[in-house]
Amino acid sequence: MMFEFLSLLCSGFFLVQRMSAHMGSYDKPFLCASPSYIVPQGQNVTLICDSHSKPNIFKVYKEDGFPILQLHEKTFTKSLDIGPVTPEYAGTYRCFHHQYPNEISAHSEPLKIIISGIYMKPFLIAPQTPLANSGENVTLECHSEIMFDTYILTSHRMEILKETLQHFQESHFSGSYASFTIGPMTPDHSGTYTCYGAYNHSLYEWSDSSDPVDIKITGEYKKPSLSSVMSPVLVSEQNMTLSCISNHQFEMFHLSREGVPQGKGIPAMQSHSGKFEAKFLLSPVIQKGNYRCYGSFKNSSHVWSSPSDPLYLPAKDNLKNLHIQIGLLVTMVLVIVVIIIIIIIIIIIIYYYYFSKKSSILEQESEVKATINRQDPERQEEHKVTYIEFEQRIFNKNLMPPISQSPKEFSIDTVVYTEVMI
């Protein structure tokens, strides 16, 4: 990995050059680009050249690659706007004094102008949480479907490019990527990172910028405290307010869930007790997890305090779903109970109908027997003897007993003879 540290804040750059001017390089001008030496294709860039010599009339030229006609024989004082830039503008530039036609001063140090947006942007993959503890190492990966020869990682603080890290690509099955390890982390490593891809044959022509990743350093100050204004047991459709309080004179407070920042910071307010506080209003739909808060200052927004103790919040959606599930369960139980009651009622009706009918039949039979007994009470004592003979389907019924066996006195005994003639 090759590290190249560049400062593109022109005032700071000039301060360093003025210090070196007193050390023997008085006639040498210095050159920088504003707002950055990485210029998106189609935009303009301002070249600034300055020195202690008077009068300050300069010329600038491009050392390599295609010549820029816009710069040919053009003089300027201190600044020169060029663009809209194309890939031909990529390269190394120098400036020099042009006081008299035959007098040319020493040339400035080279300034690289890089044109971005030539290729499709890569993707910068950050750690699971963008919050890094002081002293840790952080690994960022730049991925692309294009087989770039090299990747460049840039760090921005206060919208100014601070550092460029270059790493050769590593092939994988779906393109190429490069890993960048940063650390041990200090406040100087915090900031916004982006990455680019490029080819070795045109190192001044980069891809479009990846989406930015913010890396924040924690643990630089004492931790605040986080609490809920109301009970942490959430009620459906009810907002939750979290309060972050500290004795430290923080200017901003930040909220995170499971290590991921939640929205932007909130300005701190001093309470009646003299403490500094910020209140975070959460929407009715809350994701469950451990919440923490941090304190910071406006002039170093990427440097945070140690995290507060965690405050666990359940998800309101889960409670709502639980209420729905309980309601469905109660409804199912009621339906089952109603079905069971209906079945029991049907069984009782069938049972009642069956035994009512049987009782009616038994009563009718009892009435018939009682009627017969009332009509002929002495008949029960009669002795009946029946003889049946079958002969050609002719029936003869003799109610008279044989003469030889007839007693002299009348007898109530009756013998019935029946002959059947077949």
UniProtKB/Swiss-Prot annotation:
List of glycosylated residues: N44, N137, N200, N239, N299
Pfam families according to UniProt: ig
GO cellular component, one term: plasma membrane
Cleavable signal peptide: 1-21
Principal place of residence: membrane
Protein name as annotated: Killer cell immunoglobulin-like receptor 3DL1
Domain of life from the UniProt record: Eukaryota
Subcellular location: Cell membrane
GO molecular-function term, one example from the UniProt record: molecular adaptor activity
Keyword Cell membrane (UniProt): yes
Gene3D superfamilies: Immunoglobulins (2.60.40.10)
Disulfide bonds: C49-C95, C142-C195, C244-C293
Keyword Transferase (UniProt): no
PANTHER family (alphabetical): KILLER CELL IMMUNOGLOBULIN-LIKE RECEPTOR 2DL4, MHC CLASS I NK CELL RECEPTOR
Cytoplasmic compartment residues: 351-422
Residue ranges annotated as Extracellular topological domain: 22-329
Family membership: Belongs to the immunoglobulin superfamily.
Gene (name only): Kir3dl1
Membrane-spanning parts: 330-350
